[in-house]
Amino acid sequence: TVLFVGGVTLAASSWIFGGVEMWSLHTLFAGSALTFLLSVCPLPKWFNGRDGEHGNRRNFFRLLKFPVFWLGLFLLLYIILQASNPAWELKRSDKGWWVEEVEHITWLPSSVEGEYEKMNAFRVLASFSMAFLLVWGLWVGIRRRRSALLLLWMLAISGTAMAMVGIIQKFSGADAVLWSIESANPNFWGSFYYRNQAVGYLVLILATTAVLYFYHYNRSEKTGQSGGPHLLL
């Protein structure tokens, strides 16, 4: 169950515009939250996977021993403090926009109070929460090597397909994201409105394919096989 939900969420991250659209951000957040909940919340036996390792006490303690859990929790709490203590307020008029200072607690982290649809601290909180919930859920919920490999292959295939679409868009002179959605930024790539987001994602895909390559290469060497899945990478 964790493998399916987490894998679909990872694969979908290649195609739903990097969370720039509101519906895509909330879709990724829902998938990440569900992955995490399926990993740590108690589940009935019939819904607990073949190995019965989901939603038990050992998973919860495994989460507490994961350094990224505490790092992410600290960062999310920091962002919550910022969001709850705005030092500047965004103002708009027909002539443009500006910021005005507002009363705030000076010794606490602060932020700019803006529109959630555009960008503010709460939207940043949603983005970081989405990422950490998915990482926590996969770390706790994926216990078998076969499941981990399948998850990595899903990510690699989806990301590679997105990269190929980006290349085709570039050479075909596409003027819209995925040939259908207009973007205020003309320098989009694949399904990403901004190239810096695409680069970050493609670096993740490159690292994933490298891990898969060396894993399958070493396995082929140990078993004396002349080929293997690594040749596809």
Q: Where in the sequence are the language-model features?
A:
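Transmembrane signal-anchor hairpin modules in multi-pass inner-membrane enzymes, especially those
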Residues: 1-157, 178, 209-233
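Membrane-interface segments at transmembrane-helix junctions in multi-pass inner-membrane proteins
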Residues: 162, 175-214
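Hydrophobic alpha-helical segments characteristic of transmembrane helices
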Residues: 155-166
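Conserved donor-binding loop and adjoining core beta-sheet/short helix segment
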Residues: 172
